[in-house]
Amino acid sequence: MEVEASGTEDNGDGGAKEPEAVVSIDTETKEAADEAKSQETVPQTPTTSSDSSSSGGGGEATDGTPNAESADPPPPPPPPPPPPPSTPADSTAAAASPAVLTEMSPPPPASTSSSSSTPAAPINLLDTCAVCKQSLQNRDCEPKLLPCLHSFCLKCIPQPDRKITMPVQGPHGQDTRIVNVMRCTVCHQDYKQIDMVDNYFVKDTSEATNTSVENSTQVCTSCEDNASAIGFCVECGEWLCKTCIEAHQRVKFTKDHKIRKKEEVSPESVGTSGQRPVFCPVHKQEALKLFCETCDTLTCRDCQLLEHKEHRYQFLDEACQNQKGIIATFMTKLQEKRGLVEYSASEVQKRLKEVAETHKKVEHEIKIAVFTLINEINKKGKSLLQQLESVTKDRSMKLLSQQRDISVLAQQIIHVLNFTNWAITNGSSTALLYSKRLITYQLRLIMKARVDAVPPANGAVRFFCDPTFWAKNVVNLGNLVIEKVAPTAPPSNMMVNQQISPGHNHPGKHSGQINLAQLRLQHMQQAAIAQKHQQQHQHHQQQQHQHQHQQQQQQQQQQQQQQQQQQQQQQHQQQIQQQMRIASQMSQHPRQGAPQMIQQPPPRLISMQALHRGGVNGSSHMFPPHHLRMVSAQNRMPSAQPRLNGQPYPMMQPQLQRQHSNPGHAGPFPVASLHNISAANPTSPTSASMANAHMHRGPSSPVITPIELIPSVTNPENLPCLPDIPPIQLEDAGSSTLDNILSRYISANAYPTVGPTNPSPGPSTHSPGSSGLSNSHTPARPSSTSSTGSRGSSGTTVDQVKVKQEPGVEEECSYSGANVKTERTKDGRRSACMMSSPEGSLTPPLPILGSVSTGSVQDILRTLGENVKSEPQSDNLSSCTNPNSRATLTNGTSGSNGGQRGGATNANSQTTAGKEDDPNEDWCAVCQNGGELLCCDHCPKVFHITCHIPTLKSSPSGDWMCTFCRNLANPEIEYNCDDDPPRNKEKNEMAMSPEEQRRCERLLLHVFCHELSTEFQEPVPTSVPNYYKIIKHPMDLTLVKRKLQRKHPLHYKSPKEFVSDVRLVFSNCAKYNEMSRIIQVYDEEKQSNVQADSEVAEAGKAVSLYFEERLLEIFPEQTFPVVMEKETQIEAEKEDSDDSDDDIIQPKRKRLKVDTEMLLHIK
């Protein structure tokens, strides 16, 4: 249904029936129009039917736009819902005052016909007074529409809240006028009284309802007599009474019109034409049928000829269509803003959930700590009570024995005294003398009995404890550590200040993307400047032998220029990095030597290798697999993150998600940076020395510096409000202006081919990322197979290399004779690494761009040897610099013929061959990451050389099979692994046999490949509460892997030791989680807290069962009984000792003799 509303703001003070805002309603739905065409009626004639009325009555309002809009069905009240796909075409226009914003759509005119199709809640909100809750479809209620789009009856309109003075343009210049300010009782928004208009949506809907449903009560719409209509003019679209029909037929202009009887009129032909026309307030007899574009108001024909003479005007239908387009644009913008608001609401909800989860977690930890202390206090109290009872019982027994002896003696004395006294007083002399001997003996015997007059005092038993000391220290029992997050740019700027042009093809994009593209272009321009300086410096190096003295002067000048240029570039880079840091929170890791290294020219941006499993998976293998393994590329990054950059990882993750939602910043595009690799990779013994040597070396000495990528830790796919802008796809040459600029820049600065006769070849960085840069900038590049058979100057050929190329991957890394796999990331993005030379202005770029090396292996090694002969060699460096290794990374190194680029036209067809029939998997079987992988020739599994067990020293040559496929008794191949046994013969004799070693390696590799074993591959972080208090002998699979190597000092002597350690990993997990169940007694929310720890416990049980099954399969002839853990034995012995009386420190005998009042100290 089409609705037009327009009003003027400066015509008066808003009457009840003839307000300043004059509104004209002309309704028409798509369905009604189609049906009208099928009925051969005039298209301009609006019709009223139950179907058309059910779509919104007087029209449906747009979502927060200044005009009303109709659609099927009407949207619910705010927040505004997204419009249906057909809404922009059916949206209505309203040229009202700027202060009026509509948000509502009136209900269907007939409740009987629309009750089944339209929900009741939106109807009540749209056609009901917000104060008295009465229906507004009454003609006498005078419905009013407020600027906040709430409808009120005229009697329910709130009284003016205050008055303000507004400047107005008067006849004599600037003037002021007092305006009433009112406040909506529903939404409490302030508005001016003059901005309030009649709600013609409801009024005309009510009239349309009465006319379309009850034809018997239809009144004439051509006159003002309110006479009953008996006919309907099809051409005019008006109901006519008997008098009007006669007049209609008499007038020459309308006498040919077709008039139907009321009973014959179909609802489709009537439509909403039963609405009364809105008449001009000046010319009472003229309807408002024109729209003045100049004045933005509805006019009648007379007004257009008089007051609006020579103004631009349109008919209502044409103006309605124009306003529809404007409204559709506003709707698009508002829908985008609605998405941002909903995303912000969801983020707030997430933060609330995080707060609740943090509360539960910390509460759980506090209860564990308190419960642990309570347990220890109870134990100590029971032990003290037991010791006290033992001491007092012993003393009581001794005193009771003395008491019995004394009682017996006292009775004996009384008896003897009584008998003697009776014998003396009552007995005869003969009897006394006769019994004297017995009486005297008994008296002497009792007299000899030794009785102490004062028994020895008891030794004092005292309890020494300072309650005040413990009460004071309870304050320091535990503290809450609240980590502060770095301040970020307010997200409101992103939502409020975004401007989207009407009719934009991509409504999801924001203006901040232009800044991002400019940022990238600035980086490339800086890299171009650095490239020019590199050329100049290389030129000075070539002339060094001829003009040594002149070279020194030029070198000093060049260094000064470089320092100035580097300072400028460093300042600009710091500004850019600050913006990048605000957007992605990826600040550079503070390393040793960073101030010296940061003086390099700013590196180019690197297209991020896709994130994997929601964790921190950047470029997993920046080097070939036998290079330094980057810690930042692993799934277990959170444990290493606080050590690397000093910032807690869990608190950083939500902040990154908020900052990535701001499209005005750099987004998820990491920057290559130079770092001290030894901090990230402890297994590299010489990388630190190389970095330090580079810092103390002059600018003319070449060096191979490892490059570390800082990956973004936020998956952009999880951010719905991010702009839908793809990263710079450097592989698709010519696809964008940036790509063309980049291609021209690279081709203009490319060096000629460096052959073996070149006196000073430029050193190149042995990095697949660097070679990926070379290949990605060329529109067409030859594949690795195109270099087969090509010869260098020495006449030797490069061995053909099988490269597993995934769809969409433009980066190639070749190994001689081995199957090397370059993977695309899991989210489908191409792994195109674009970086500058790591030496900055000190090192020239790669000699050949876009082509695979065609020179011989010996030439390459000799060329590299000349460049790095002054550098210390590391075991972890690429075997490209080792002449003894046959597995050579040929991609990215210098060839001998620059004309090889001419064969680049067949590159794409060759690289895409064989992609579909590749039987190998796409991800490493252990770490589930992509990168350069070794493909087994007998099974589909692939591995990184550092993930395989045993770990390989370098990439193998020829056919290769994994540990799963190799024969245990008689292996087909021997691995080139850095696992030389110790020279001590005794240790070799005590070690496992080679077959047992291979069996243990296969069993451990099975465990590593289990999908639930990730939690057990690394040591448990110290942040896990009370873990190292409960677990006294921690163990992890990586430690088992190291101990399985024969060079390890604690190498396993038998498979039983190996099995025992693996079982210890899972028993520790079960023990820790079993301990956590004790907290149920003191926890109010038992199930939730226990369930939080049960996931790792269930994973431990599953992997343990899997390990036992594989153990029976690999060692069928051996049995490995479960040995009681050392910790359990120690605890059992400790409990036995606690129950005994040995813990009581007995008093020394020397003090017993000296001091009878000895103090007995009890533990």
From Swiss-Prot:
Presence of the UniProt keyword Zinc-finger in the record: yes
Function: May act as an E3 ubiquitin-protein ligase and a transcriptional repressor. Involved in the regulation of embryonic and adult hematopoiesis. Required for normal development and survival of both committed erythroid progenitor cells and posterior mesenchymal cells.
Entry coiled-coil feature ranges: 345-369
Acidic residues bias (residue ranges): 1133-1144
Compositionally biased residues, Basic residues: 534-548
Gene: trim33
Gene Ontology cellular component annotations, sorted alphabetically: chromatin; nucleus
E.C. code: 2.3.2.27
Compositional bias ranges of the Low complexity kind: 45-54, 88-99, 524-533, 678-691, 753-797
Residues given in the record as Zn(2+) 2 binding sites: 280, 283, 303, 308
Organism name: Danio rerio (Zebrafish)
Zinc finger (RING-type): 129-188
Alphabetized UniProt keyword annotations: Bromodomain, Coiled coil, DNA-binding, Metal-binding, Nucleus, Repeat, Repressor, Transcription, Transcription regulation, Transferase, Ubl conjugation pathway, Zinc, Zinc-finger
Domain Bromo: 991-1114
Bias (Basic and acidic residues): 27-38, 821-830
Binding positions (Zn(2+) 1): 220, 223, 244, 257
Molecular function terms from GO: DNA binding; transferase activity; zinc ion binding
The protein's enzyme class: transferase
Protein name: E3 ubiquitin-protein ligase TRIM33
